[in-house]
Amino acid sequence: MKSNFKYFLSLFVIQIFINPLYLLANQQIKGFDTGQNKKSKVVALTSLSADLVGNLSISSLVGIPGSSLFKNEKEFQNIPIVSRGRMQPDIEKIISLKPDFVIGAKGFHDKTLRKLEDLGISTISTNIKSFKDLESFESQLQNLLSTKKKGNLENNLKSCYLKIDSSRNNKNVLALVSLKPMLSPNSESWSGSLIKRFGFDNLTADLPSKGEFKGYLNINQEWLLKNQPNNLLLVKTPASSLDQYKSLTIWNKLSAVKNKKIFGFEYYGFINPGSLSSINKACKKLSNI
């Protein structure tokens, strides 16, 4: 009974921390006139959209989500916070800021965005699952903000634009996002797209995602032992540590463990894009494998 409780608790934690992945830019814009010349006022409900808007036009950003990623960022300190954690945004506060449009995450913010649309406020629903999505979103924001400042992802994400060494094609990797259940990303996830960007052979890239976490699939210890990845990418979520993976009964039988090819990754940047800084850190780690 106790083990069942731990399993369902793990599912709950994973649901909280993985789902935002899919809630972040294939853009669906409602009610916004892209031809206007006035300075736009934006409320961003995700940390990544806030960072992107701030990078293009910090004066346009009038509302942001409360996020640990902004704790030491001076430019965000005096901008009103409209949401915290997994709580739904404060609609009254958003309205009081009189934004021209509000950027939210597809799925998680659907209800909030619908209410704002009913009140005549334009919205953008985002769903970033690849680097291409990120580049497209920044380009679109530049047009929406009517700013002459060009997108400069390459300057902010220098580690993500490094020349790829062709020798990496001979390196296979396996990323483990969690232990119970044991989840690994395929090519339809943000982390899967980053792995592909660096030319690695992701052992689960082409395997179908059949569970509740789209872009991620369940694997077991038998599969892991049979496929023997050369490199293991282990993710530390806000609710776990890297030491949890050592509890696997097959841990010491894995060639990646024997050869000390274990690489730790933070949740933000690798699983949930989070911010430009966290994405760049994830890319830097991938470039060092």
Feature-to-residue mapping (PLM):
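Structured C-terminal subdomain patch of bacterial secreted/periplasmic proteins
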Residues: 40-41, 45, 132-146, 150-155, ...
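Alpha-to-beta junction loops
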Residues: 98-102, 200, 228-232
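A short, structured surface patch at a secondary-structure boundary
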Residues: 41-97, 101-106, 203
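Short helix-initiation/N-cap motifs at beta->coil->alpha
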Residues: 82-92, 209-222
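Bacterial Sec-exported substrate-binding components of ABC uptake systems
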Residues: 2-52, 89, 147-176, 226-228, ...
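Flexible loop/hinge segments that line or gate small-molecule binding clefts
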Residues: 73, 112-140, 264
